[in-house]
């Protein structure tokens, strides 16, 4: 179900527009679909038809502005956001969808994702003519190639090919068996232009990608938030990941 865009009062609009001003250039562009912030002072933008996201320096986008923006968006959506409630899923007055994650559910910085509301009315034929489905590749060929590498016992080639083909990889082993070491080695094979989001209880994953965001599950001790891995998985899917890395799987996630 799509929620109705909130209607902000004049005073609320003044504050909201002020905090959104650093993003105004991209909010106004028809070809921009995603506006992302992983940490202060930088903005990532995705445009229609572009294979890679753009990185822009944004010195005015500091921690204070991001926190104020989060509180203002929460206010106009009749929500609250704080260290005890650090996840915010909301809508801007123009219809753009917003997901924000605040500490302690991040590695220290406020994270922001704005997905602009863009709904095209087209026929099924037009959809397949214009869609990116043909670029997905032949999964049967991928499976055959991976099977051949295993048959040849080329395990290095197998893992490199599996990462390149964006296969789902599950690493399992006993305590101190090198699971995290292997995971960090696999992450180095991910192309730098891809967006990586990690979810962990304790930050151990080394995020080498330029466009990377680390989210942290919180157990709720000492008055902090109760944010589960499952909560963060749902939030991360609204933050445009190319790759989603989960440190430990224990239950419903």
Predicted regions and their residues:
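N-terminal accessory targeting/assembly segments
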Residues: 1-94
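Conserved lysine of the Walker
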Residues: 179
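P-loop NTP-binding catalytic core
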Residues: 54-64, 75-164
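Conserved nucleotide-binding/hydrolysis micro-motifs of P-loop NTPases
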Residues: 41-42, 61, 104-107, 118-120, ...
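Walker A (P-loop) phosphate-binding loop of P-loop NTPases
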Residues: 176
